[in-house]
């Protein structure tokens, strides 16, 4: 059985959307929500890097794709949560206890991912000269 064929940008956008969907569900711990928020932002950043033709390294350290985006002349959206705080969920809190005092709210996680999504969708559309790349994945 064959399905639609997607390019790397589209695959990363699809995977980011899957991680973002977890934030809207119920029953997940704060660590899991933070992890999926971090993963969504990471994949969105890497989708934009792919769109501008930059090969990204496989790392969960969000500062690295951010640095590559800045070097490529791209910007980051202003978000309620800094990348450094999200980064903790990909590494430290996957294997350690998350103190309640450092836990961002679900609202902050959703807003941060949503701002990145909107930013990346807009940039991919502008850079490709067409909404087709984004529309192919948002219609799934």
Spans of model-derived segments:
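Terminal alpha-helical segments
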Residues: 1-140
């Amino acid at each position: 059985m064959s399905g639609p064929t997607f390019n790397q940008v589209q695959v990363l956008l699809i995977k980011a959307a899957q991680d973002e969907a977890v934030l809207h569900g119920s029953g997940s711990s704060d660590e899991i929500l933070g992890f999926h928020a971090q993963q969504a932002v990471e994949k969105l950043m890497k989708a934009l890097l792919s769109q501008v033709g930059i090969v990204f390294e496989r790392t969960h350290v969000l500062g690295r794709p951010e640095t590559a985006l800045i070097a490529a002349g791209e910007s980051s959206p202003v978000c309620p949560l800094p990348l450094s705080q999200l980064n903790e969920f990909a590494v430290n809190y996957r294997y350690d206890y998350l103190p309640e005092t450092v836990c961002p709210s679900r609202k902050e996680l959703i807003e941060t991912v949503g701002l990145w999504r909107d930013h990346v969708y807009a940039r991919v559309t502008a850079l490709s000269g067409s909404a087709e790349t984004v529309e192919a994945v948002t219609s799934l």
